[in-house]
């Protein structure tokens, strides 16, 4: 076997059964990318990793929660630098543990069978100890909306480049809590009207198309809509648009490096 195959076997053997126990029974592979999917009411959770054939390096990706309706609608909108659909990308992304990050860096420095084994063991621990809490956090739209309203800026939670994250967020609000959407549109209007923040006019055109289409999509259910939730986003007073945009760009840059 090649070094990549040796590392992959040693890495995967530690947690293959754990994924099955936790419901990640659907498997998909595209080239060097391996993804395991678990369905929930509004979409599916994704756990994935990449095994680089040339070097033997294995990189674990943070878990993802894909809201299928959101992702389907987003695919219908054309916008600049649109990435090809990926089986490993969802609407929201979790975080890996500090121990996993350390072992990931060790693997990157020395992609050996030993480092693959240690990373596989820590991946098993992560699945057993952390994955369920991630699923609970991102399985109910109403709970997500409530959490978003306490954040410094709601779009920070969504995957993608800063403008794409806002697109995802607006679609999600339309489906999950449309009564809160006007406030989010007011904020996003300010972003896309600013040439300092969004230089490409193509984004403004795509944004107008999205705004026109948003009312066509009906909410998931009034049961998950946060009708009684009135705490406003702190975005208005605590943070400047420029500071938020810089943060989102940095966040997206880190995500791209991890792919």
What kind of feature is each model-predicted range?
Residues 2-12, 28-259:
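Intrinsically disordered, low-complexity regulatory regions enriched in serine/threonine/proline
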Residues 20-29:
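Short secondary-structure junctions
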